[in-house]
UniProtKB/Swiss-Prot annotation:
Subcellular location: Cytoplasm; Nucleus
SUPFAM superfamilies: DNA/RNA polymerases (SSF56672), Ribonuclease H-like (SSF53098)
Keywords, sorted A to Z: Aspartyl protease, ATP-binding, Cytoplasm, DNA integration, DNA recombination, DNA-binding, DNA-directed DNA polymerase, Endonuclease, Hydrolase, Magnesium, Metal-binding, Multifunctional enzyme, Nuclease, Nucleotide-binding, Nucleotidyltransferase, Nucleus, Phosphoprotein, Protease, RNA-binding, RNA-directed DNA polymerase, Transferase, Transposable element, Transposition, Viral release from host cell, Virion maturation, Zinc, Zinc-finger
UniProt name for this protein: Transposon Ty1-PL Gag-Pol polyprotein
Record bears the keyword Amino-acid biosynthesis: no
UniProt function note: Capsid protein (CA) is the structural component of the virus-like particle (VLP), forming the shell that encapsulates the retrotransposons dimeric RNA genome. The particles are assembled from trimer-clustered units and there are holes in the capsid shells that allow for the diffusion of macromolecules. CA also has nucleocapsid-like chaperone activity, promoting primer tRNA(i)-Met annealing to the multipartite primer-binding site (PBS), dimerization of Ty1 RNA and initiation of reverse transcription.
Subunit relationships: The capsid protein forms a homotrimer, from which the VLPs are assembled. The protease is a homodimer, whose active site consists of two apposed aspartic acid residues.
Positions of Mg(2+) 2 binding: D1346, D1427, D1428
Additional comment: Retrotransposons are mobile genetic entities that are able to replicate via an RNA intermediate and a reverse transcription step. In contrast to retroviruses, retrotransposons are non-infectious, lack an envelope and remain intracellular. Ty1 retrotransposons belong to the copia elements (pseudoviridae).
PTM field: Initially, virus-like particles (VLPs) are composed of the structural unprocessed proteins Gag and Gag-Pol, and also contain the host initiator methionine tRNA (tRNA(i)-Met) which serves as a primer for minus-strand DNA synthesis, and a dimer of genomic Ty RNA. Processing of the polyproteins occurs within the particle and proceeds by an ordered pathway, called maturation. First, the protease (PR) is released by autocatalytic cleavage of the Gag-Pol polyprotein yielding capsid protein p45 and a Pol-p154 precursor protein.
Coiled-coil region(s): none
Catalytic machinery residues: D461
Length: 1755
């Protein structure tokens, strides 16, 4: 064979661009160019014609003699080793690098020109010579065939090789146009193939068959350069060569890919137009073929619609499918899918009719129609390198197992396929040869081959468990009459004649033998991959070869049709006698009926019943002996298993082994119940229970959801509790297969802790009886307790917890002990237990006034888990508290009398039980008690409150027998409190805040006025009620004003129309005197003129009027009322919905009636909509929470689990900081180094742009005379301190331009080389925002400028040296700086002084005092930020005049002149601004965030949902120590710095609503726990979801005579570590938010009032500075205002009493604040808490509140 001859050649030699080729050529793979046969033949004919004169005379050539070329020797004479071939384009084996060529493919000067190599230049003549290869032995570029297994050379091949040198290779034509490149590259590839370089040509998968050598690469490069001039190359080729001018392989690969794509499209269109289908192949295969073609065409831009596709498909239908062409042609909207449904239906009908005829032998048509796959339950595991390509599909396997009816005679197989590589051989038919492959038909005369069979080959089958062959010629060691049962895919027996060995002789000269079965009744000869795998042979369908496990290639695999084949030439023939095999053996068992057949015949009855029936002759025609019962015992009928499947029998007492094998608390059962619907958000919807197998001790935990992290927290809690309290380790936990238990997170947790999860089997609930029965028992108890007590359904878990406590204390009838006794705990002290729902009176230790009653009605729920108190529900406050200060409400008419238990009361029995406990309570009541533990850790449903938008009913009025006791009990002792009608509310508002399930903050001890409209800090609902006006020392009077008020707790004592005056005590903040303020009517209030301010001891009076003003000073020019309205009118405050009037019923008389006999259908149905009128809370610390953030994050969940753990303290502060020190936040590095931008940049276009920017920067440096170019200094002569390292940095701006900057390494600059006192000033962000706001209100033009290389205009005073830029190549030299290079410590200050001097002296500007980089004159305002200038002016010509002056000195570019009257877009210092003069301004960063956030590697939108708020209330950061290695710690700290750095940049630019979260998380940069990172991810996720939000400004009303500057202040008392408070301020100019600040108070405050005073005092200095700036930039009068929601703070500011302050720090701040308010003409007003937009700066808010406070100014 030719391939075998080529494989003998010596190692690769190297030759010229024109090489000889053998007479016959075996190609290694399919032509990647898919050149048509006609074109190939034309090319070959042309080549033959051109070389026709050279066939007889070896020295003849088609090219004239060239003086550079020596005449070659005749081809018959082998050249010497160093042969006389000095030609520049020829090389022998020992001449790898001739002159004119360089190593590794880099060409040197080539001594010949392209025309000398072109046969078109000289006409061929007998005297002309053309470079050629030497004889075959030394063929320079011959490639050995990797599949040539023989190492010997026969004479014929040698002769052929000798004659092959007589032919010469015709070079490709010259490329003359870029458009001709596709055709030219085809001829060039053909040229390489003729030059024996076919192995280096990339195949269809882009990889060559073998590795190219360096000399071959040189040959490739030179020939390409010669025949393809660079001026005629396409652009994409030039781009490749610009990266690597020797990468010809990449050009060839892309060319092949392009041509393959074009060829594939044409083939697909032709195939689709010529579809044919008659049912001979499976319908699913036909559908797959068609849909794949349509999909490929659609993906390539050739759209095939349904109508056209259906027409093409129906046109090719024939046979039984033809009628579809007539039934479907009228359907206009028919789809391809619908058409294939009909085709599948017909195909399945055909197969059903054929399969219903059992026959061992089928005709030839059956071979094509059977589509059932071969299934063999006993087949071993299939071993294949690429199982996707194995022949195990339905269609393939079915045809492989069809039974043939032909009589195949034994024959000899001499098939052979010549193949020089391991690439796949694709054969479309028996005669189709691609790339020169030859297929010699087998001489075996097989008759009636299948149409899709490849003769002379074995079909590779991964589904066959045995190898089957029709011819006995290759069977060795055959034995006839084997007792082997073989069935096909339809479970039909295949008669086997003999069994023997099949012996292979592979091309690596190894022999292998496998077992084979002989039968003539098959369609194909099958070679089982399973049996090959048993002898360490696998089929690799990636390379299409049979190989061993060590990678040794044994034989090629041929793909023909849909199957893969291997040639029979590797089989060794045998001399077996055929007649001895063809004698089919018939055993005794074949004459009997098989039992499976009888089993199915008799309706799948069992074997015992069938045998009994045959014995008793109830079934006739055959006897019991006629059935083969050998397989009846172990036979399993699949249909019986499916149809008669039942659950396994649960074995009683099966858990006894666990009780005996495990110690207490080692084996737990757990289950989850829920959800319970129609409950408020604060109430849990699920609970999870645990039961110990040995002790039967039970735990229950509430759950709000079933998320992975929630369940994980419970498991962590229970395991820690058992370990610490019982010194036991849980070994096994039994649970069901719910997703909350089978998730990966919990599985890893259990695995980490060495716990074995024991799951129940599917649908086997009885195996989980312990947990299921416990849940049922607890739910029964829950329903009973709620029904008995009449408590609302949202307290359902309290009933569960009460039942758990009791059940753990009751003895089991089986064990005679309680669970507590088994656990080693003391019995339950019943004297500490109260009936569930027992009415009690709870002491209120902090009433709103001294005359308020101190008792609050409540209902006992269960003993506290975390203290010695009791959990009590207070319906008036809509919360539960943990307290010991309560008294049991007693009376003859007990709460339980409604159940008619013989009219019995249990008061005396209850007294007797709780006598000792009462004495304890009584003794403690002597002291001032603070046990109303609002700070309790009992957080799962504490602080349950109603929707805050409606007023709340507080039931705390003292009741007399006259107005509370019914007639039947009116004569009772008046000292006893009657409770006949004490009823707990049935339901609460379903909108109860989820955030309020956590304990609220302690009430401030600051005196407050009790009013139904006041908040916890003195809030009001009416916004337009100013409390302070500017104070004047010359005009200070006390106000005697009072207003009509309703007592907060006794709101029902007064009617709405009541007009009498009532004195209300007012407690003081720092004094001891109490004063009374008479209530007056609204009419009198409006007529009052306020002249005097009350003392500090008096709290401010209240009025329902919206025009009540309590001033400190009365302005002389503007009335107080107009000032207040003017300041508040334009503020972006939320609009609150109107509140409906609410009645406040008597706590003991007007509670809504409850029908105790009303029953709930189920716990899941709790929460009917018959709740009474919702009542509202006024406490600022309790906010409404509409929904929770719906993104699942680990640890992002409130830890609300409860167990029997001992009492423990827990700090209740939001987002606590775990570290004190915080490093500076590092910004994200957006620049590239030189090596990143240029050296190793694979993006050619980007690289070119960076190179251009590099040269531009160098030219600018030289132009500016940055360094002294006259002298270079030696490094050894200069003090190292004065040598500054330098570098180039590159970045891409948002406008798409690429920029390079040469900078100094100022970060390592020595301190002696600069003046530390100099400062680099830039414009303050507040100054820029103020200027922008004034520009909008005054219709200013805004012009943006940029000064190129600004720092280089500033001279440098110090003596500094730098290393020259890299392109200069002077690494050992230094140059002296003359200009302020970017990066130096002093450069910024030098530039600031330079530009400042120029603006003042040349431009006539002056700098605003106190505001650096803000310059102004009478017409123009300039804000300077390094080299960026923003100009504001009423007259655009004034801006142009400044620009003209600047251009005289500096290279000034106009970024945006701002002359358009339409919307103009700016990019100013990172802010993306949309400005339409006289209308609006929008500030955002959408484009910047869209670019930067994805680079942070934060997972965005894990569930595809957007966040509605940046955080949720009630979350705590764990303070546990981090267990983390140093490298991981540094990595996470760096990640936190990047994330918080970006968030800070955005927050302080315009997203002031995020400042609280940013400030809090910034404190945790050095504590990067998983929880902290998750919270940071949530913040980044929210920024991503809201990246399109903008700060919206609208132009102020033109009629406004003044500028109004307002600071809104707020504080959250004690919500930071070490009892520090969070304070926040928002600044507004003319109703536009221009800045915000959120920070932790520097001092520890002891009350809410102190925190509010601290917040206000922090806002005043900046307010005054902004006021000065505004007056300098705009000459309008200015009104300054302070808004706060703390009345007590306002009272202190306006008071003149200086006698008492709580401490000197507090007193100092208060006194200073008084002076600042008085001396700076500040107006102080009260703002309602619900409208205080600064609330977002101090605490995390629920979604509804967050949106309400921000949607007016940022959206």
């Amino acid at each position: 064979m030719e391939s075998q001859q080529l494989s003998q050649h010596s190692p690769i030699s190297h030759g010229s661009a024109c090489a000889s080729v053998t007479s016959k050529e075996v190609h290694t793979n399919q032509d990647p160019l898919d050149v048509s046969a006609s074109k190939t033949e034309e090319c070959e004919k042309a080549s033959t014609k051109a070389n026709s004169q050279q066939t007889t005379t070896p020295a003849s050539s088609a090219v004239p003699e060239n003086p550079h070329h020596a005449s070659p020797q005749p081809a018959s004479v082998p050249p010497p080793q160093n042969g006389p071939y000095p030609q520049q384009c020829m090389m022998t084996q020992n001449q790898a690098n001739p002159s004119g060529w360089s190593f590794y493919g880099h060409p040197s000067m080539i001594p010949y020109t392209p025309y000398q190599m072109s046969p078109m230049y000289f006409p061929p003549g007998p005297q002309s010579q053309f470079p050629q290869y030497p004889s075959s032995v030394g063929t320079p570029l011959s490639t050995p065939s990797p599949e040539s297994g023989n190492t010997f050379t026969d004479s014929s091949s040698a002769d052929s090789d000798m004659t092959s040198t007589k032919k010469y290779v015709r070079p490709p034509p010259m490329l003359t146009s870029p458009n001709d490149f596709p055709n030219w590259v085809k001829t060039y590839i053909k040229f390489l193939q003729n030059s024996n370089l076919g192995g280096i040509i990339p195949t269809v998968n882009g990889k060559p068959v073998r590795q190219i050598t360096d000399d071959e690469l040189t040959f490739l490069y030179n020939t390409f350069q010669i025949f393809a001039p660079s001026q005629f190359l396409p652009t994409w080729v030039k781009d490749i060569l610009s990266v690597d001018y020797t990468d010809i392989m990449k050009i060839l690969s892309k060319s092949i890919e392009k041509m393959q794509s074009d060829t594939q499209e044409a083939n697909d269109i032709v195939t689709l137009a010529n579809l044919q289908y008659n049912g001979s192949t499976p319908a699913d295969a036909f559908e797959t073929k068609v849909t794949n073609i349509i999909d490929r065409l659609n993906n390539n831009g050739i759209h095939i619609n349904n109508k056209v596709a259906c027409q093409l498909i129906m046109r090719g239908l024939s046979g039984e499918y033809k009628f579809l062409r007539y039934t479907r042609h009228r359907h206009l909207n028919m789809t391809v899918a619908e058409l294939f449904l009909d085709i599948h239906a017909i195909y399945e009908e055909q197969q059903g009719s054929r399969n219903s005829k059992p026959n061992y032998r089928r005709n030839l048509s059956d071979e094509k129609n059977d589509s059932r796959s071969y299934t063999n339950t006993t087949k071993p595991k299939v071993i294949a390198r690429n199982p996707q390509k194995t022949n195990n599909s339905k269609s393939k396997t079915a045809r492989a197992h069809n039974v043939s009816t032909s009589n195949n005679s034994p024959s000899t197989d001499n098939d052979s396929i010549s193949k020089s590589t391991t690439e796949p051989i694709q054969l479309n038919n028996k005669h189709d040869l691609h790339l020169g492959q030859e297929l010699t038909e087998s001489t075996v005369n097989h008759t009636n081959h299948s149409d899709d069979e490849l003769p002379g080959h074995l079909l590779l089958d991964s589904g066959a468990s045995r190898t089957l062959i029709r011819s006995a010629h290759h069977i060795h060691s055959a034995s006839s009459n084997p007792d082997i049962n073989v069935v096909d895919a339809q479970k039909r027996n295949i008669p086997i004649n003999a069994i023997g060995d099949l012996q292979f002789h592979f091309q690596d000269n190894t022999k292998t033998s496998i077992k084979v079965l002989h039968t003539p009744n098959i369609a194909y000869d099958l070679l089982s991959l399973n049996e090959l795998a048993a002898v360490d042979i696998t089929a690799c369908f990636t390379k299409n070869v049979l190989e061993r496990s060590d990678g040794t290639v044994l034989a090629p695999i041929v793909k023909y049709g849909d199957f893969y084949w291997v040639s029979k030439k590797y089989l060794l023939p045998s001399n077996i006698s055929v007649p001895t095999i063809n004698n089919v053996h018939t055993s005794e068992s074949t004459r009997k009926y098989p039992y499976p057949f009888i089993h199915r015949m008799l309706a799948h009855a069992n074997a015992q019943t069938i045998r009994y029936s045959l014995k008793n002759n109830t079934i006739t025609y055959f006897n019991e002996s006629d059935v083969d019962w050998s397989s009846a015992i172990d036979y399993q009928c699949p249909d019986c298993l499916i149809g008669k499947s039942t659950k396994h029998r649960h074995i009683k007492g099966s858990r006894l082994k666990y009780q005996n094998s495990y110690e207490p608390f080692q084996y737990l059962h757990t289950d989850i119940f829920g959800p319970v619907h129609n409950l408020p958000n604060s109430a849990p919807s699920y609970f999870i229970s645990f039961t110990d197998e040995t002790t039967k001790f039970r735990w229950v935990y509430p759950l709000h959801d079933r998320r992975e992290d929630s369940i994980l927290d419970v498991f962590t809690t229970i395991l820690a509790f058992i370990k610490n309290q019982f010194q036991a380790s849980v070994l096994v936990i039994q649970m069901d297969r719910g997703s909350e238990y089978t998730n990966r997170t919990l599985h890893k947790f259990l695995e980490k802790n060495g716990i074995t999860p024991c799951y129940t089997t599917t649908a086997d609930s009885r195996a989980h009886g312990v947990a299921e029965r416990l849940n049922r028992t607890l739910l029964d108890d829950c329903r009973t307790q709620l029904q008995c007590s009449g408590l609302p359904n949202h307290l359902w878990f309290s009933a569960i917890e009460f039942s758990t406590i009791v059940r753990n204390s009751l003895a089991s009838p089986k064990s005679k002990k309680s669970a507590r006794q088994h656990a080693g705990l003391a019995g339950l002290d019943i004297s500490t237990l109260l009936p569930f729902g027992q009415p009690v009176i709870v002491n209120d230790h902090n009433p709103n006034s001294k005359i308020h009653p101190r008792g609050i009605p409540g209902y006992a729920l269960h003993p506290s888990r975390n203290s010695y108190g009791y959990i009590i529900y207070l319906p008036s406050l809509k919360k539960t508290v943990d307290t010991t200060n309560y008294v049991i409400l007693q009376g003859k008419e007990s709460r339980l009398d409604q159940f008619n238990y013989d009219a019995l009361t249990f008061d005396e029995d209850l007294n007797r039980l709780t006598a000792s406990y009462h004495s304890f309570i009584a003794s403690n009541e002597i002291q001032e008690s603070n046990d109303l533990n609002i700070e309790s850790d009992h957080d799962f449903q504490s602080d349950i409150e109603l929707h805050p938008e409606q007023p709340r009913n507080v039931l705390s009025k003292a009741v007399s027998p006259t107005d509370s006791t019914p007639p039947s009990t009116h004569t009772e002792d008046s000292k006893r409190v009657s409770k006949t009608n004490i009823r707990a509310p049935r339901e609460v508002d379903p909108n109860i805040s989820e955030s309020n399930i956590l304990p609220s903050k302690k009430r401030s001890s600051t005196p407050q006025i009790s009013n139904i409209e006041s908040t916890g800090s003195g809030g009001m609902h009416k916004l337009n009620v100013p409390l302070l006006a500017p104070m004047s020392q010359s005009n200070t009077h006390e106000s005697s004003h009072a207003s009509k008020s309703k007592d907060f707790r006794h709101s029902d004592s007064y009617s709405e129309n009541e007009t009498n005056h009532t004195n209300v005590p007012i407690s003081s903040t720092g004094g001891t005197n109490n004063k009374t303020v008479p209530q007056i009517s609204d009419q009198e209030t409006e007529k009052r003129i306020i002249h005097r301010s009350p003392s500090i001891d008096a709290s401010p009076p209240e009025n329902n009027s919206s025009h009540n003003i309590v001033p400190i000073k009365t302005p002389t020019t503007v009335s107080e009322q107009n000032t207040e309205e003017s300041i508040i009118a334009d503020l972006p405050l939320p609009d609150l919905p109107p509140e409906s009037p609410t009645e406040f019923p008597d706590p003991f008389k007007e509670l809504p009636p409850i029908n105790s006999r009303q029953t709930n259908s189920s716990l899941g149905g709790i929460g009917d909509s018959n709740a009474y009128t919702t009542i509202n809370s006024k406490k600022r610390s309790l906010e409404d929470n509409e929904t929770e953030i719906k993104v699942s994050r680990d640890t992002w969940n409130t830890k609300n689990m409860r167990s029997l753990e001992p009492p423990r303290s827990k700090k209740r502060i939001h987002l606590i900081a775990a570290v004190k020190a915080v490093k500076s936040i590092k910004p994200i590095r957006t620049t590239l180094r030189y090596d990143e931008a240029i050296t190793y940049n694979k993006d050619i276009k980007e690289k070119e742009k960076y190179i251009e920017a590099y040269h531009k920067e160098v030219n600018q440096l030289l132009k500016m005379k940055t360094w002294d170019t006259d002298e270079y200094y030696d490094r050894k002569e200069i003090d190292p301190k004065r040598v500054i390292n330098s570098m180039f940095i590159f970045n891409k701006k948002r406008d798409g331009t690429h920029k390079a900057r040469f900078v100094a390494r100022g970060d390592i600059q020595h301190p002696d080389t600069y003046d530390s006192g100099m400062q680099s000033n830039t414009v303050h962000h507040y100054a820029l925002m103020t200027s922008l706001s004034l520009a909008l209100d005054n219709n200013y033009y805004i012009t943006q400028l940029d000064i190129s290389s600004a720092y280089l205009y500033a001279d440098i005073k110090e003596e500094l040296y730098i290393r020259p830029p890299p392109h200069l190549g002077m690494n050992d030299k230094l140059i002296r700086l003359k200009k302020s290079l970017y990066g130096l410590k002093q450069s910024g200050a030098n530039w600031y002084e330079t530009i400042k001097s120029y603006l003042i002296k040349q431009c006539g500007m002056e700098e605003v005092r106190g505001w650096s980089c803000v310059f102004k004159n009478s017409q123009v305002t300039i804000c300077l930020f390094v080299d960026d200038m923003i100009l504001f002016s009423k007259d655009l010509n004034a801006n142009k005049k400044i620009i003209t002056t600047l251009k005289k000195q500096y290279d000034t570019k106009i970024i945006n002149l701002g002359e358009s009257d339409n919307e103009i877009q700016y990019d100013i210092l990172g802010l993306e601004i949309k400005y339409q003069r006289g209308k609006y301004m929008k500030l955002g960063m959408e484009n910047s965030l869209t670019e930067k956030i994805p680079k942070l590697n934060v997972p965005l939108n894990p569930k595809g949902r957007k966040l509605s708020a940046p955080g949720q209330p009630g979350l705590y950061i764990d303070q546990d120590e981090l267990e983390i290695d140093e490298d991981e710690y540094k990595e996470k700290v760096h990640e936190m710095q990047k994330l918080i750095g970006l968030a800070s940049y955005v927050g302080y630019k315009f997203r002031f609503d995020l400042l609280y979260y940013i400030n809090t998380l910034a404190q945790h940069i050095l504590f990067p726990s998983r929880q902290v990172l998750d919270m940071t991810y949530e913040l980044i996720q929210f920024m991503w979801d809201t990246r399109d939000k903008q700060l919206i400004w609208h132009k102020n009303k033109p009629t406004e005579p003044d500028n109004k500057l307002v600071a809104i202040s707020d504080a959250s008392y004690g919500n930071q570590p070490y009892y520090k408070s969070q304070i926040g301020n928002i600044y507004l100019l003319n109703g536009k938010v221009i800045g915000g600040k959120s920070t932790k108070a520097s001092l520890t405050c002891t009350s809410t009032t102190e925190a509010e005073i601290h917040a206000i005092s922090e806002s005043v200095p900046l307010l005054n500075n902004l006021s000065y700036l505004i007056q300098e930039l705009n000459k309008k009068p200015i009104i300054k205002g302070l808004l706060t929601d703390s009345r007590s703070t306002i009272s202190i500011i306006k008071s003149t009493n200086e006698e008492k302050f709580r401490n000197r720090f507090f007193g100092t701040k208060a006194m200073r604040l008084r002076d600042e308010v008085s001396g700076n003409n500040l107006y102080v007003y009260y703002i309602e808490t619900k409208k205080n937009i600064a609330d977002v700066m101090t605490k995390p808010l629920p979604i509804k509140t967050f949106k309400l406070l921000t949607n007016k100014w940022i959206h």
